[in-house]
Swiss-Prot record:
Species for this entry: Spinacia oleracea (Spinach)
Descriptive protein name: Photosystem I reaction center subunit V, chloroplastic
Family of the protein in this entry: Belongs to the PsaG/PsaK family.
InterPro entries, sorted: PSI_PsaG (IPR017494), PSI_PsaG/PsaK (IPR000549), PSI_PsaG/PsaK_dom (IPR023618), PSI_PsaG/PsaK_pln (IPR016370)
Keyword Transit peptide: yes
C-alpha cells in the first residue's frame, strides 16, 4: 500500500511519464496518466484510446467556444514593477521630496547639522546617483517593492477567480 501511495504521489507531481505501470496499478494509471496544475488546483487529464476520435472532436469544440486568459506571472511582475518605478520617478518624485523636506527635524528653524551636531550629517555616498533629479537606490527599492506588492495582489486575486467588475 505504501509503495502504491508513493508511486501515485510521484506520478501526480511529475510530468507525463511513458513508463509502463505494474499490473495491479494499471487501472489507476489509466485514469491519472497526466496531472497538470492550474494555480493550486489540479487538472485531471484523462487519456483514453478507445474513444479518442469522439473525445478529440468534443474537446476541440469546447476549446473553440471558451476563451480563457491566464496571466503570465513574470510578465505581470515585470510590468507592475516597471510601471511603479516610472510613476515614482516621473509622477510622484517632487511630491515625495516636498513631504520629506517637511519632516526633517529642526531646532530653532535650522536642521540639527546646521546647528552644530556633526553626527546628524547624512551618509551622502549611499544616496548619490547620476540621475538628474536624484532618484537613488532607496527610491528604486521602495518603488520596486510597491510594484511587486501590486503584482502579487493581481496574481493572487486572478488565480482564485476573483473578478472585481469595476465597470
Amino acid at each position: 500500500m505504501a509503495a502504491a501511495t508513493a508511486s501515485l504521489s510521484s506520478t501526480l507531481l511529475a510530468p507525463c511519464s511513458s513508463k509502463q505501470p505494474q499490473p495491479q496499478q494499471q487501472h489507476q494509471h489509466q485514469q491519472l496518466k497526466c496531472k497538470s496544475f492550474s494555480g493550486l488546483r489540479p487538472l485531471k487529464l484523462n487519456i483514453s484510446s478507445n474513444n479518442s476520435s469522439s473525445s478529440l472532436s468534443m474537446s476541440s469544440a469546447r476549446r473553440s467556444m471558451t476563451c480563457r486568459a491566464e496571466l503570465s506571472p513574470s510578465l505581470v511582475i515585470s510590468l507592475s514593477t516597471g510601471l511603479s518605478l516610472f510613476l515614482g520617478r516621473f509622477v510622484f518624485f517632487n511630491f515625495q521630496r516636498e513631504n520629506m523636506a517637511k519632516q526633517v527635524p529642526e531646532q530653532n528653524g535650522m536642521s540639527h547639522f546646521e546647528a552644530g551636531d556633526t553626527r546628524a550629517k547624512e551618509y551622502v555616498s549611499l544616496l548619490k546617483s547620476n540621475d538628474p533629479v536624484g532618484f537613488n537606490i532607496v527610491d528604486v527599492l521602495a518603488w520596486g517593492s510597491i510594484g511587486h506588492i501590486v503584482a502579487y495582489y493581481i496574481l493572487a486575486t486572478a488565480s482564485n477567480g476573483y473578478d472585481p467588475s469595476f465597470f
